[in-house]
Design a protein with these regions (language model features):
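Beta-alpha junction/loop-to-helix N-cap segments that form part of ligand/metal-binding clefts
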Residues: 24-29, 50-55, 69-141, 150, ...
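Periplasmic-binding protein-like
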Residues: 40-42, 99-111, 131-133, 175-178, ...
Length: 332
């Protein structure tokens, strides 16, 4: 099992938040404390819950580190208000509306581009800025003047991964597998295909139905087709099953995954096997010793945090991104 770190492009964000310049999202508690509410729009249940909880973990750690903010000469307590979008495009709009009704100043999230696109219009209609943390599909912010992001885009990471397949493995044929109808999966596969084919390669694409758990047919097809690499930008749950089943089948084709596969559950599935797994990532443990020590201490001294992190103190890239997003929000 191997990892590589793709370049993270610095992105300029110019935010003009009514909430931070007026009364939106500000309130007084019973104790008299002034409060600013930051909405957390994340999947706490469903297929993307593992990633969503880890993204929230970074925000919660940052909030514990810096629980107040100075605004117009006054100190405000920062309160994180969570709303579960259920990893679902159907549930995302109501989860977004819930945050709007609770009077948040701005919103962080969500993990999962599909849910971000489904819920985003609610924030735009309310005039509340949302900061995407790891929702990489370009369509998340397209046409929505209130949705921003701090992460790289899918067209960028797909190009990096496609070129990596060519440069590392001299790949001529790529087998691409994603969930049918999933905006994130299919968007990445589309971008990957364009770059790979433009370089003279051949792409074989397949889609599996939602809630599928047996990937044997797809993996055997990848092998019989003579694929040099397998590109599967899927959810943590699907990726874990695919890696485990590929190991059982003795698949020796290198796997290339997007940012979602940089997760301790997926990486653990590949450890101790002959699976070659390469992923793109926002952050790799060791990048900031100070952050690494702080978040590990936080996880190991908080049973709930450790559970949300999958039971260990491995630092997920999305946790680092959640941490950064919180501080971007405070600076907005």
């Amino acid at each position: 099992m191997k990892k590589f770190v793709s370049l993270l492009l610095a992105m300029l964000m110019v935010l003009s938040l009514v909430a931070c310049g007026g009364d939106g999202g500000q309130s007084n508690t019973n104790s008299g404390d002034k409060v600013i509410k930051i909405g957390v729009f994340e999947p706490l249940s469903g297929d993307s819950a593992s990633g969503g909880k880890k993204e929230v973990l970074g925000m919660q750690y940052a909030n514990s580190e810096t629980p107040t903010v100075e605004l117009n000469g006054e100190t405000y307590k920062v309160e994180l208000v969570l709303s579960d979008n259920g990893s679902s495009t159907d549930k995302a709009p109501s989860a977004a509306s819930d945050l709007v009704s609770k009077g948040v100043s701005l919103v962080l999230g969500t993990y999962g581009s599909g849910a971000a696109m489904a819920g985003g219009p609610k924030f735009g209609e309310a005039g509340i800025a949302a900061i995407g943390v790891t929702c990489t599909n370009p369509n998340v912010t397209a046409g929505n003047d209130y949705y921003f992001r701090i992460c790289f885009l899918d067209n960028f990471q797909s190009a990096v991964l496609s070129n990596f397949a060519k440069d590392k493995f001299a790949a001529k044929t790529a087998y691409c597998l994603g969930e049918n109808g999933n905006e994130y999966d299919q968007g990445l596969i589309s971008y990957f295909t364009k770059v790979f084919e433009a370089a003279g390669g051949t792409v074989i694409t397949d889609s599996f139905p939602t809630n599928n758990s047996d990937f044997t047919t797809y993996l055997n097809k990848a092998k019989s087709s003579g694929a040099d690499v397998i590109f599967t930008p899927v959810s943590i749950a699907y990726a874990t099953q695919i890696i485990q089943q590929a190991s059982s089948l003795g698949i020796d084709i290198p796997f290339i995954g997007s940012d979602t596969l940089d997760d301790n559950k997926v990486l653990a599935a590949a450890q101790g096997t002959n699976i070659q797994l390469y992923v793109s990532t926002f952050y790799q443990e060791g990048g900031s010793p100070e952050f690494d020590k702080g978040i590990k201490d936080y996880i190991n001294n908080n049973a709930s945090a450790k559970s949300d992190n999958g039971g260990d103190d491995t630092i997920s890239a999305v946790t680092a991104m959640g941490y950064d997003a919180y501080y971007v929000a405070l600076e907005a």
